[in-house]
Amino acid sequence: FKIALLYSGQPRHLKEAFPNHHDTFWKPNDSYQIDVFAHMWYDEKWIGNYFWDQYKDRGRWEADLKEFMIENWNPKAILFEEPKEFEAEDIIPDPRFPHPVNNIISQFYSISQANALKKQYEDDNNFKYDCVVRLRTDEYFQRPIGPINEYNLDSINVLKEWAHVEHGINDHFAFGSSELMDKYLDVYENFVEIAEMGAEINPECIIGFNAQIRHKLPVTKNDWKYVLWRDKK
């Protein structure tokens, strides 16, 4: 039983949250092979600065983050890229739950790049992972997820919560079969189509729209308990 774990985006609270990931996710699944694939935004010249000046509780760029990732994740493949701006002048955030459009596109680009590394590894080795997991570096699980193979992997497993609209899905953590997750995570490549189909321009609305309306994927909502590191009490 093989699991692909995808990390992406800014390495927020990576070092603080990793012991929690180890205890609540890696340990309950340590009898399985867990391979990490990651696409991370990283720019040496930003070391010491906050990820987002407006929100200092989201952490800083640190000099040893790259080394930490390679040592602790032992990734099958990892790609570091300097943050970049995405052109999207005609895409407007939904005013009910606004989120900077560049951040939205950047998030889904990074997720797509991590998943592309996974797909390339599958193609090169002529197999499919039994399960693919998308996880933020700054997630803090308040109770263990448990053994992954006890879940229905012919469905996208997500958090049971209301995420803005009926089709909205919490965008921090999800898993399912490799084939289903390839569709769940293909937002960046199809961003314009998804927007033109009527998705609200907000991360949780877009990923949920892509899964439940565009692809009509089976989705299972689970009573997990987790928060972002910055929100933990």
Positions of predicted regions on the chain:
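Short aromatic/hydrophobic "clamp" motif used to bind/position activated sugar donors
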Residues: 132, 138
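N-proximal low-complexity "stem/linker" segments adjacent to membrane-targeting elements
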Residues: 1-19
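Short alpha-helix within the catalytic core of nucleotide-sugar-dependent glycosyltransferases
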Residues: 18-22, 119, 142-153
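Local beta-strand N-terminus motif with an aromatic residue
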Residues: 1-3, 33-34, 128-129
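Active-site-proximal specificity loops/subdomain of glycosyltransferases
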Residues: 39-128
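Short acidic, S/G/P-rich loop/turn micro-motifs used as interaction or catalytic elements
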Residues: 11-15, 45, 140-142
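Short, acidic, metal-binding catalytic loop of nucleotide-sugar glycosyltransferases
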Residues: 20-33
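Catalytic core and acceptor-binding pocket of nucleotide-sugar-dependent glycosyltransferases
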Residues: 100-127, 140-144, 162-233
